Curated annotation (Swiss-Prot):
Tree of life domain: Bacteria
Presence of the UniProt keyword Nucleus in the record: no
Pfam families from the UniProt entry: EFP, EFP_N, Elong-fact-P_C
Functional note: Involved in peptide bond synthesis. Stimulates efficient translation and peptide-bond synthesis on native or reconstituted 70S ribosomes in vitro. Probably functions indirectly by altering the affinity of the ribosome for aminoacyl-tRNA, thus increasing their reactivity as acceptors for peptidyl transferase.
An annotated GO BP: peptide biosynthetic process
Keyword Protein biosynthesis applies: yes
Gene: efp
Identification of the protein by name: Elongation factor P
Biological or metabolic pathway of the protein: Protein biosynthesis; polypeptide chain elongation
Principal location class: cytoplasm
Residue pairs linked by disulfide bridges in the UniProt entry: none
GO molecular function, one term: translation elongation factor activity
């Protein structure tokens, strides 16, 4: 339990019947008339939904501990992603829903952060940018600007993104894992 006076960004609260909410923003307000209160912006850890919530100052709220561990993606086992703890070599099977959009960028050997609460996997987080190889793309045609200078390309994971016309099959590129945007070539 913590007081609303102790809130800080990143703190995870247990509200609304056990749902986990992360504090994105908070502001202590002391109006000229009336009691002080804390205005917060909270993000649901599982769904990503963002809500505004106001608490009276000094009220106790339940906090939750999220265990984040760096784990290496080993292989797919049916619909499950198998991760290995780099310290204990224990294996953890994570379902596709918990992996989320990170599945578009996972290849064997990648290190990801796996977040758990009371033994349940909440989400899998990748670094902001990863390096992947272009598996397939059409050759860029000189003067083709109808698509704004980009063309579709399939990554080695099977995920499709837009890349500049000069990128060819087999090249290694850097991709933003949050937006699926092309960031640049990787110098070998």
């Amino acid at each position: 339990m913590a007081s609303t006076n102790d809130l800080k960004n990143g703190l995870v609260l247990k509200l609304d019947g056990g749902q986990l909410w992360s504090v994105v923003e908070f502001q202590h307000v002391k109006p000229g008339k009336g009691p002080a209160f804390v205005r917060t912006k909270l993000k649901n850890v599982l769904s990503g939904k963002v809500v505004d919530k106001t608490f009276n100052a000094g009220v106790k709220v339940e906090t939750a501990t999220i265990d984040k561990r760096d784990m290496q993606f080993s292989y797919m086992d049916g619909e499950y992603f198998v991760f290995m703890d780099m310290d204990t070599y224990d294996q953890l099977m994570v379902d596709r829903k918990s992996v989320g959009d990170a599945a578009n960028f996972l290849i064997e050997g990648f290190t990801a952060t796996v977040a758990q609460h009371e033994g349940e996997v909440l989400f899998v987080e990748l670094p902001a940018a990863v390096e992947l190889v272009i598996q397939e793309t059409e050759p860029g045609v000189q003067g083709d600007r109808s698509t704004g200078g980009t063309k579709p390309a399939t990554l080695e994971t099977g995920h499709q993104i837009q890349v500049p016309l000069f990128i060819t099959t087999g090249e290694k590129i850097k991709v933003d894992t949050r937006t699926s945007d092309y960031l640049g070539r990787v110098n070998s």
